[in-house]
C-alpha cells in the first residue's frame, strides 16, 4: 500500500488579457510543441474574429459553446467474462469541460479553412448556435450511452 497522499488538484491559472481561467484551459489544449505564445495568438485572433462577426461578448460565446458541447455521460469499456461492454458512466463537470474543449479543438482542426484561428472561431460560433462537429460528437456519445443503458449495472 502506498504511503503517499493524493496530490492536490491544481486550479487553472487565468490568462493575462481576459483574466479568465477558461481561456487559459483552451490555450493549454491548443498548445503544440511548447509554443504557448503561438497558442495565445491563435485564441486571441479567434476571439477577435468572433467579436467582429457576432458583435457579442466573445467570452460569452466561448462559454456558451463549451456549455453546449459538455457531455453529461460517456461510455467506458469494461471487460466482464471475456467480452467487452461499453458501460455508460456519468462524468463530473470538470471532466466534461475538458472533454468539451478537446472536442471543440479537434473539430476545428479537422475543419477546412485558411488557418487555425479562422477555423476555431467558426467552430466556436457554430457550437454556440447548437450545430457543428463538436455538437455532433456530444450527441453521438449520448446516443451510445443511451443504447448501452442496459449495461449500466456493470459500473
From Swiss-Prot:
Coiled coil stretches, renumbered: none
Endpoints of the signal sequence: none
GO terms under biological process: translation
InterPro entries given in the database record: Ribosomal_uS7, Ribosomal_uS7_bac/org-type, Ribosomal_uS7_CS, Ribosomal_uS7_dom, Ribosomal_uS7_dom_sf
Localization of this protein: Plastid, Chloroplast
Alphabetized UniProt keyword annotations: Chloroplast, Plastid, Ribonucleoprotein, Ribosomal protein, RNA-binding, rRNA-binding
Gene Ontology molecular functions: rRNA binding; structural constituent of ribosome
One Gene Ontology term, aspect cellular component: chloroplast
Annotated PANTHER family: RIBOSOMAL PROTEIN S7
Family label: Belongs to the universal ribosomal protein uS7 family.
Known function: One of the primary rRNA binding proteins, it binds directly to 16S rRNA where it nucleates assembly of the head domain of the 30S subunit.
NCBIfam families named among the record's database cross-references: rpsG_bact
Name this polypeptide is given: Small ribosomal subunit protein uS7c
Organism: Cedrus deodara
Amino acid at each position: 500500500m502506498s504511503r503517499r497522499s493524493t496530490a492536490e488538484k491544481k486550479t487553472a491559472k487565468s490568462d493575462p488579457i481576459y483574466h479568465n481561467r477558461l481561456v487559459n484551459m483552451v490555450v493549454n489544449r491548443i498548445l503544440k510543441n511548447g509554443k504557448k505564445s503561438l497558442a495565445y495568438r491563435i485564441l486571441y485572433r479567434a476571439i477577435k474574429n468572433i467579436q467582429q462577426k457576432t458583435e457579442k461578448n466573445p467570452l460569452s460565446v466561448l462559454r456558451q459553446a463549451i456549455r453546449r458541447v459538455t457531455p453529461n455521460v460517456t461510455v467506458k469499456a469494461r471487460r466482464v467474462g471475456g467480452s467487452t461492454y461499453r458501460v455508460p458512466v456519468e462524468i463530473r463537470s470538470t471532466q466534461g469541460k475538458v472533454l468539451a474543449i478537446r472536442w471543440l479543438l479537434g473539430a476545428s482542426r479537422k475543419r477546412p479553412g485558411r488557418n487555425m484561428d479562422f477555423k476555431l472561431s467558426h467552430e466556436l460560433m457554430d457550437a454556440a448556435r447548437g450545430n457543428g462537429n463538436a455538437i455532433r460528437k456530444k450527441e453521438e456519445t449520448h446516443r451510445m450511452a443511451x443504447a448501452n443503458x442496459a449495461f449500466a449495472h456493470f459500473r
